């Protein structure tokens, strides 16, 4: 039966099945505990940074994979320790944060020192690419640690879940509207399949989900609508 489907239907089926598996993993990690959520983010961080550095190497750059990934892990650990309500490592969150900050302050100079001995043709490019991986991948994922405690000082998984729902609503509506109604391309040179119709469809889906989140969580509607727009 699958051979009789059009390419669009096959693509939709693959996206649906993979999305369902991803949804189970992500939602399960968020609902299980703060630590499982942190482990999921950390796995995404390491995988994302290694992929980023791999792509950078294909473009002729020479990032410091080990130091860059280590800096990203430490940055994540700093933020997770700061928001965690039951961390006991090194005597508590404040001690863990201080220790991680000291380690982070050592890692950054270490990148510059190591670059002196790597004998690369463009050391500035190597350092810049390494730091870009930290800023582009590790920093956003580290800041996601704060989302479940927005509006309170306790772990509230449903805040994170609805934040994820907003992202998914944007992706799903953008894909469906773009696939069925997409006519005007946004940036054909960079992404030939992205259309303005899909963009506004995704925006509408995100805003609708933001409104639902505000009602379910009994939170500020305008705050969630603003979050959805961003």
Stretches found by the model and what they are:
Residues 2-228:
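Membrane-embedded alpha-helical bundles of polytopic integral membrane proteins
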